[in-house]
């Protein structure tokens, strides 16, 4: 990483490719998901079109931008964090400006750098920022997921299902590449059990849902 540019985080990709005949997206994700605090697996639902027949895995988050409860929160690779004041009038224009300002803080170059973007989701509740639709806003003690969150990952793995190819892209240099390759070769995969605690409940009553 080079921060010679004021307020800009500059990275250059390190890339490696291999045949994916011995790997599956789920199998690779299970081997890599514990490398960082956040990881994602996004699989394509279209295996017939070569342009869309891809799956992506992101691990080792570097930065993120999230929208929740009228606030926009940004975190950066140097540990800095910004949180906007609560704004009941937060709209699509404000969010677009925040995303543009966030993206301008990063300069990523090198082979396959087009894959080093933001990965995340926009939830159904985010409709409140784009349309005149009221959404019940509740803060939960657990699993209080943002309405919108997108993350820049240090490491991206791209499965090209049409050509049976796996491309590994890292912003962590050769050391990052070696770490990923070592994790890929692990024979054992740690699994975690889960069970429900208590009875199912909903924040919306049957009448409200109707």
Task: Set out the residue ranges of the language-model regions.
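Signature of the chorismate-utilizing enzyme
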Residues: 1-210
